[in-house]
């Protein structure tokens, strides 16, 4: 330990001696970055431990109602994380693509791959938890639980299907979207992200007041996206643009529609699973 401390001190002194003020600023920046990163990792670890504690308590309980309530709590936590992932990475993917940011797209794709593994783990844990409930409860609530997991999985895969062609398009230096396409999709993206935020907050708080308004908003968004799709197909027919650009744009529209639909469907089955009957 003493040797390591001596080595670090020597290195810092060496850098400051030859780097001067710039080196000092760089070292301060590095220290701040490491501190922030440490805090983020600590927060994530605590959240994971909290989730594990709920599952551990669930597996140890023999009371059917307590098991159901713990599973409901665990489900709100897990599905809330999925909606947050979708919100963040849908926006990140679209923004990175519109600004031709290859690094941002690669980061989003890496997040998708990691989230797919978490989805598999969530489903395995959920199956074990459902086995702890009595048959009547499983018959009454099981379908809604499994449907919720399926819609959550589809959200993650939709973000992946959106990100992959965008990443390939930018990586190959293909022609970007034109100004009209960028403006159209940027506007609808903002509304979709807001809808995802609203859905997540309602799901996490188990408060579905005015949910019919969210359904109406989702229908409006899908209508807007369908209109964008028709306009793009007309551009293809008139041969007024690049086919490669049109194909990636149509994929973006389709996956955006899927994300809106899966999010609302997730909320519907979550409300039924959480309902006290």
Show which residues each predicted segment covers.
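Short, conserved aromatic-histidine micro-motifs
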Residues: 2, 33-35, 181-185
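Hydrophobic core of alpha-helical transmembrane segments in multi-pass integral membrane proteins
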Residues: 26-38
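Cytosolic, long alpha-helical scaffolding segments
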Residues: 39-277
């Amino acid at each position: 330990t003493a040797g390591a401390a001596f080595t670090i001190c020597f290195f810092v002194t060496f850098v400051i001696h030859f780097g001067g003020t710039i080196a000092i600023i760089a070292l301060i920046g590095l220290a701040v970055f490491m501190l922030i990163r440490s805090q983020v990792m600590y927060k994530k670890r605590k959240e994971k431990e909290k989730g594990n504690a709920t599952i551990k308590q669930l597996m140890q309980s023999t009371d059917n109602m307590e098991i159901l309530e713990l599973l409901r709590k665990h489900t709100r936590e897990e599905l809330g994380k999925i909606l947050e992932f979708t919100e963040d990475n849908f926006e990140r993917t679209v923004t990175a693509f519109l600004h031709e940011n290859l690094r941002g797209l690669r980061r989003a794709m890496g997040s998708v791959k990691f989230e797919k593994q978490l989805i598999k783990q969530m489903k395995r844990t959920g199956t074990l938890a459902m086995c702890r409930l009595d048959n009547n409860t499983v018959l009454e609530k099981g379908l809604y639980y499994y449907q919720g997991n399926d819609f959550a999985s589809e959200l993650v895969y939709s973000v992946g299907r959106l990100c992959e062609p965008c990443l390939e398009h930018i990586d190959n230096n293909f022609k970007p979207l034109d100004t009209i396409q960028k403006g159209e999709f940027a506007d609808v993206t903002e509304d979709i992200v807001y809808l995802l935020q609203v859905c997540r907050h309602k799901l996490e708080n188990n408060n579905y007041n005015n949910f019919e308004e969210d359904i109406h908003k989702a229908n409006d968004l899908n209508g807007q996206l369908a209109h964008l799709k028709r306009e793009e197909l007309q551009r293809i027919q008139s041969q007024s643009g690049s086919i490669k650009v049109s194909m990636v744009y149509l994929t973006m529209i389709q996956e955006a529609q899927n994300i809106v639909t899966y999010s609302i469907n997730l909320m519907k089955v979550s409300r039924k699973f959480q309902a006290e009957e």
